[in-house]
Swiss-Prot record:
Extent of Basic and acidic residues compositional bias: 116-182, 220-231
PROSITE patterns registered for this protein in UniProt: G_TR_2, IF2
Limits of the tr-type G domain: 387-554
Pfam families: EF-G_D2 (PF22042), GTP_EFTU (PF00009), GTP_EFTU_D2 (PF03144), IF-2 (PF11987), IF2_assoc (PF08364), IF2_N (PF04760)
Spans annotated as G5: 532-534
Comp. bias intervals (Pro residues): 77-93
Native species: Rhizobium meliloti (strain 1021)
Gene name, Swiss-Prot/TrEMBL: infB
G2: region residues: 421-425
Region named G1: 396-403
Family statement: Belongs to the TRAFAC class translation factor GTPase superfamily. Classic translation factor GTPase family. IF-2 subfamily.
GO cellular component, one term: cytosol
Protein's UniProt name: Translation initiation factor IF-2
InterPro entries documented for this protein: EF-G-like_DII (IPR053905), EFTu-like_2 (IPR004161), IF2_assoc_dom_bac (IPR013575), IF2_II (IPR044145), IF2_N (IPR006847), P-loop_NTPase (IPR027417), Small_GTP-bd (IPR005225), T_Tr_GTP-bd_dom (IPR000795)
Region (G3): 442-445
């Protein structure tokens, strides 16, 4: 405490605080560097440690004050000695901050043995790190030299290759190139010589880069020593915050442009070091030569003709790309033809073909329908063909016994399952006779199912025409004959009901001659068999005739290929989904295959035959029910197996888009020409009877739609808002409510939600199972929409003899009835000079001042009109009665 003892006397006048300094503590002040030239005085207290006494052999180590980093920038270093590359020893340069820093008041203590040992270890570790750093720098130097040598070798090889190319050029071009290369090569060589370091040689003393390198090495050495001292903490008092000095670059001497020597600027880029204009580089010369060669080759290049694939519509830009021509050239050609178009404009295939032909290319036309190529009509090899069962269609007039005949053949009773005893579906069945199978298709006979008969004839090999012996040839019989002839299938005539007393088979044969059906007994080639379905008479003869005809036709198919056939019927079954009855005509259909039927597709989940049994495969001429389609296809659509779901989806989407476009075309087809506009004006006053029709199968819905279309007249017609196969749902009721339509269910029922919704909305749902009843009821309902017919009945004429003006009554005409009679309250017309002046009713009819109901011919009477008094003598009054009669379709 004696060192810091103050001799001043204590007083209360000063601002100092009375404190008691602890013993064993020394105080001092140091200047702390705050950065950017700012300093701060800091009070430092050092506490002495009372440790054990030192041994005699242990020498005290006086701590050395921290030496500031040396800066070798004030004087230029000496050039290196040729014997080695030692770093020059620069003069230590004291920073300004260290010079201005006060040294007074710093007290340093002795270091303990542990601290000295820690500092020795830190110094040894720093030396090891410095050795490793020096070794790494040496390895980097060796690697850089190796890379430089490799680069020089590559440049030599490139120069040799270039020289060989120059030697191979024609003499004239080589001379021109040499002149340009000579003009450019000196500058290039000088620049390369300046910028490329020479490995393995010591830099001369006059080179300015060497002193810089020496200074850099000296600076690195000084910085490493300073870092070592900073890490060891030598010379720094304990507790002092030491801020590391930022490494400052060595100052360069004036006129030292080493850093800016290789910098490329806009000014120096085009001028060499000697001030001359820079010439072209070798790369530029080489590019020019290649461009010249290309231009020479283009002059002699021949036109390449390509095959251009053209869709139905294409843009000009895409067409030019497919032809490998410029779009500008195509537009120029179109401008010459008088068409101003842009590259993004669409053109049709005809114009695109004309453009491609003008440019010398061939054309291959494609369309969207090409997605269906390769599905149907695939040719088979004759060696793979095998015999198949015949497909026989039973056709004829209604109630002539077609289904009963088929029942007798199948030993089943199908008629009992049909409502009203008439066939309303196409039934496909398979029977076996003498070990050979025959596939039968039963078609409806009445007029509503014309499309079904046509479909059955298209998918058949033989048509069996059933004619009742007691009823002879009827309208649907003639229609069936026409369908069979149109399909080009042979006909076998089955004269049914020969067991009836009124049967006359010979009359049937004679009437068939009128329709060009010549049976064998009449000298023709058509087979005829007299059968009785009721008594099962001559059924075996009918089957033998069918097998005989099939042998003549020699029916064959390839079962070892993808399946192909026709959709006979389709329905939406509750629990099974969409069910399609198909007839396989080629190949074999198995579960798991992907099929496309019309605009629907799906994977076959199950195959069910006509007996309700699940089968694993369906060969040619086999009728089966297919489960797994996405929707119900239309009856008569063809189906085929495809290889993948993507192909099936693509075909299905194309067909659905085609159907939508056709529907839109039908709706918008009424606009256009004047005749179409007149037709639209005529049909604009037609009353419509909206209907929502749900049926059990697609074919029945088609038959109902066709029958209702025939009911339409010029005044009223049926409009089917929606139709589909399946039960009546709540959405159908909502649609009917929105369109104010009636709901008709044919062999289907509505679910509970649909019934509740119909009761709330007041929509009537009618159920039918016989198509005749459905058509009759719709016909009666449509008749109610017809405006009643106005019928006018002539009663008589009266001639006005005199006109009287009576008070409170007005003008009264004194008349004589010249024809018929005149009644009060009927319609009258006032005719003057054969022109109708007024039409109204009689207000009063009097004879001799008495009101009478009628006046006969030859009698006189007085008549007055309601709200009309312009009557004159000589006018004629015509009396008539109007009646409104209800019309029917």
């Amino acid at each position: 405490m004696t060192d810091n003892k103050d001799d001043k006397t204590l007083s209360v006048a000063g601002k100092k605080t009375l404190t008691l300094k602890p013993s064993g503590v020394t105080q001092g002040t140091v200047r702390q560097d705050m950065g950017r030239g700012r300093t701060k005085a800091v009070v430092v207290e050092t506490k002495r440690t009372r440790g054990p006494l030192k041994h005699k052999d242990e020498r005290p180590i006086t701590p050395v004050a921290a030496t500031p980093a040396a800066r070798p920038a004030e004087q230029r270093p000496m050039p290196p000695q040729p014997s080695g590359r030692p770093a020059p020893q620069p003069q230590p340069h004291q920073p300004r901050q260290e010079q201005n820093r006060p040294r007074g008041g710093v007290v340093l203590n002795d270091l303990s043995a542990g601290e000295m040992e820690a500092r020795r270890r830190a110094l040894a570790e720093a030396q090891i790190r410095d050795a490793e750093e020096a070794k790494r720098r040496a390895e980097d130097e060796v690697r850089r030299r190796r890379e430089e040598e490799e680069r020089l070798a590559r440049e030599k090889e490139e120069a040799a290759r270039r020289a060989a190319e120059e030697a191979a050029r024609p003499p004239v071009e080589a001379e021109k190139t040499e002149e340009k290369v000579e003009a450019a090569s000196p500058a290039v060589g000088e620049r390369r010589a300046e910028t490329r370091p020479q490995p393995g040689r010591a830099a001369p003393a006059a080179t300015p880069a060497a002193p810089d390198g020496a200074a850099l090495r000296g600076r690195r050495g000084t910085e490493s020593e300073e870092d070592e001292r900073r890490r060891s903490g030598a010379g720094a008092p304990r507790g002092k915050v030491v801020r590391p000095e930022p490494a400052k670059p060595a100052p360069r001497a004036k006129g030292d442009e080493g850093r800016r020597q290789g910098k490329l600027t806009l000014t120096t880029a085009a001028v060499d070091e000697d001030g001359s204009q820079r010439g072209r580089s070798l790369s530029a010369m080489r590019r020019r030569q290649e461009k010249f060669k290309r231009s020479q080759m283009q002059e002699t290049r021949e036109k390449i003709s390509r095959e251009v694939v053209l869709p139905e519509t294409i843009t000009i830009q895409e067409l030019s790309q497919r032809m490998s021509e410029r779009a500008v050239d195509v537009i120029k050609f179109l401008m010459k033809e008088g068409q101003m178009m842009k590259p993004g404009d669409l053109i049709d295939a005809d114009l695109a073909e004309l453009i491609a032909g003008e440019f010398g290319h061939t054309v291959k036309r494609v369309s969207e329908s090409d997605v269906e190529e390769g599905i149907f009509n695939i040719s088979d090899v004759d060696d793979d063909m095998q015999s198949r069962p015949p497909i026989v269609t039973i056709m004829g007039h209604v109630d002539h016994g077609k289904t009963s005949l088929l029942d007798a053949i199948r030993h089943a009773n199908v008629v009992a399952g049909e409502a009203g005893g008439i066939t309303q579906h196409i039934g496909a069945y398979q029977v076996e006779q003498n070990g050979q199978k025959i596939t039968f298709i039963d078609t409806p006979g009445h007029a509503a199912f014309t499309a079904m008969r046509a479909r059955g004839a298209q998918a058949t090999d033989i048509a069996v025409l059933v004619v009742a012996a007691d009823d002879s040839v009827m309208p649907q019989t003639i229609e069936s004959i026409n369908h069979a002839k149109a399909a080009g299938v042979p006909i076998i005539v089955a004269i049914n009901k020969i067991d009836k007393p009124s049967a006359n088979p010979q009359k049937v044969r004679t009437e068939l001659l009128q329709h060009e059906v010549f049976v064998e007994s009449m000298g023709g080639e058509v087979l005829d068999v007299e059968v009785s379905a009721k008594n099962q008479t001559n059924l075996d003869k009918l089957l033998e005739a069918i097998l005989l005809q099939s042998e003549i036709l020699d029916l064959k198919a390839n079962p070892n290929r993808t399946a192909e056939g026709t959709v006979v019927e389709a329905e939406l079954d509750r629990g099974r989904g969409a069910v399609a009855t198909v007839l396989v005509q080629k190949g074999t259909l198995t579960p798991g295959q992907i099929i496309v039927a019309g605009d629907q597709w799906g994977r076959v989940r199950a195959l069910v035959n006509d007996k309700g049994e699940h089968v694993k495969a369906a060969g040619p001429s086999t009728p089966v029910e297919v489960l797994g389609l996405s929707g119900t296809p239309a009856a008569g659509d063809r189906f085929a197996v495809v290889e993948s779901e993507s192909r099936a989806r693509e075909i299905s989407e194309y067909r659905q888009r085609l159907a939508r476009e056709k529907a839109v075309a039908r709706q918008s087809g009424s606009r256009g020409s004047l005749e179409q506009m007149m037709t639209q004006l005529q049909t604009s006053g037609v009353k419509e009877f909206p209907l929502v029709i749900k049926g059990d199968v697609q074919g029945s819905i088609e038959a109902i739609s066709g029958a209702l279309d025939k009911l339409g007249t010029d005044e009223v017609r049926a409009r089917i808002v929606h139709s589909g196969a399946g039960g009546i749902t709540e959405s159908d009721v909502s649609l009917a409510e929105a369109s104010n339509a009636a709901i008709i269910g044919f062999n289907v029922r509505a679910n509970k939600q649909a019934r509740d919704a119909s009761e709330r909305a007041g929509i009537e749902i009618r159920y039918y199972n016989i198509i005749y009843d459905l058509v009759d009821d719709v016909k009666a309902a449509m008749s109610g929409l017809l405006s009643p017919e106005r019928r006018e009945t002539f009663l008589g004429n009266a001639e006005i003899l005199e006109v009287f003006n009576i008070t409170k009554v007005g003008k009264v005409a004194g008349c004589r009835v010249t024809e018929g009679k005149v009644e009060r309250g009927v319609g009258v017309r006032l005719v003057r000079d054969n022109v109708v002046i007024h039409e109204g009713k009689l207000k009063t009819l009097k004879r001799f001042k008495d009101e009478v109901s009628e006046v006969q011919s030859g009698q006189e009477c007085g008549m007055a009109f309601e709200n009309y008094e312009d009557i004159r003598a000589g006018d004629t009054i015509e009396c008539f009665r109007v009646e409104h009669v209800t019309r029917t379709l």
